[in-house]
């Protein structure tokens, strides 16, 4: 009986594991191997150069700046997305008026969830078209038009949101490492938050609906207000869901390639204002001025994979609950 069950499980696992090995692990192995060579990506002939490409990453000013941009995204994007999603999920599920029937959500909450979730079903290309119209650097842009009508911006000098290279936090240097947050990069983060809040709102909302209403009613009877109920009751019970969301958003923050290409002029924006690790990797893949550009890009790809794995491990370690709360 056990042998038959083992064969059954093995048979079902064989195909997906084989596909994972062929299409995920093997390409990673090839990328690591090519990163140790001077391959052009087009010729089978190449020489072994060791970790030369990896050492060069530490002197690549654009790549180091791109890492800084990913750090800014990693700091702002997950935090604001989770906070906004948690706030609206709480208000939609427990933000209604309490009555004899107990704690209720906001009337028409399903409609609000649909509205919030709608950006999630749009492709990145459509999102880019919409927000390029919003950020357009003349009075025809939606945001500029509003600011001009309010008298906050001169009609003759509209703001070029996606072309602004000035940093909102100045420029912080740590040796060769540069940390800055150009206005154009902040604009991309806002777009990413807008597109992601809906999904996590639905995720947190579903988790809140699984919490018995008796718990919230008991907190209300004990004199807890909505703020105390959220921080002392709701949030601890959603700890695992927030941890998962944090990991997914952290991984997404290390990518951002589609938004960079879709929204900013050129790959990486003006003066590399929106350059991220993935966009600089793609730019270096087929540089005509460097014969081993493909090998150098492979080194970037491997470094991004390592950073992503370390980040996911650290986030899971930090946010993992030591004891599981049950209800």
How should each PLM-predicted stretch be described?
Residues 2-327:
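A structural signal for multi-pass alpha-helical bundles of membrane permease subunits
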């Amino acid at each position: 009986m056990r042998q038959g069950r083992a064969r059954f499980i093995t048979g079902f696992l064989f195909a997906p594991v084989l596909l994972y090995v062929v299409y995920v692990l093997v390409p990673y192995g090839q990328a690591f191997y090519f990163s140790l060579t001077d391959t052009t990506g087009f010729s089978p002939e190449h020489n072994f150069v060791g970790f030369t490409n990896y050492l060069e990453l530490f002197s690549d000013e654009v790549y180091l700046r791109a890492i800084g941009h990913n750090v800014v995204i990693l700091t702002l994007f997950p935090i604001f997305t989770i906070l906004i999603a948690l706030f609206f999920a709480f208000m939609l599920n427990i933000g209604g008026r309490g009555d004899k029937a107990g704690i209720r959500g906001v009337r028409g909450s399903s409609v609000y969830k649909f509205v919030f979730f709608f950006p999630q079903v749009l492709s990145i290309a459509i999102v880019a078209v919409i927000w390029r119209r919003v950020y357009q650097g003349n009075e025809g842009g939606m945001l500029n038009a509003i600011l001009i009508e309010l008298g906050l911006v001169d009609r003759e000098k509209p703001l070029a949101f996606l072309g602004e290279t000035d940093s909102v936090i100045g420029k912080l240097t740590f040796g060769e490492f540069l940390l800055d947050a150009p206005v154009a990069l902040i604009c991309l983060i806002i777009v990413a938050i807008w597109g992601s809040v809906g999904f996590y709102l639905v995720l947190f909302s579903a988790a809140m609906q699984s919490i018995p209403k008796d718990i919230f009613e008991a907190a209300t009877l004990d004199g807890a207000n909505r703020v105390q109920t959220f921080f002392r009751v709701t949030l601890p019970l959603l700890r695992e869901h927030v941890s998962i969301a944090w990991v997914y958003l952290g991984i997404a923050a290390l990518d951002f390639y589609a938004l960079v290409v879709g929204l900013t002029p050129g790959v990486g924006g003006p003066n590399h204002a929106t350059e991220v690790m993935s966009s600089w990797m793609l730019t270096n893949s087929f540089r005509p001025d460097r014969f081993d550009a493909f090998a150098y890009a492979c080194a970037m790809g491997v470094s991004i994979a390592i950073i992503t794995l370390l980040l996911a491990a650290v986030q899971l370690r930090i946010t993992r609950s030591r004891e599981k709360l049950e209800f």
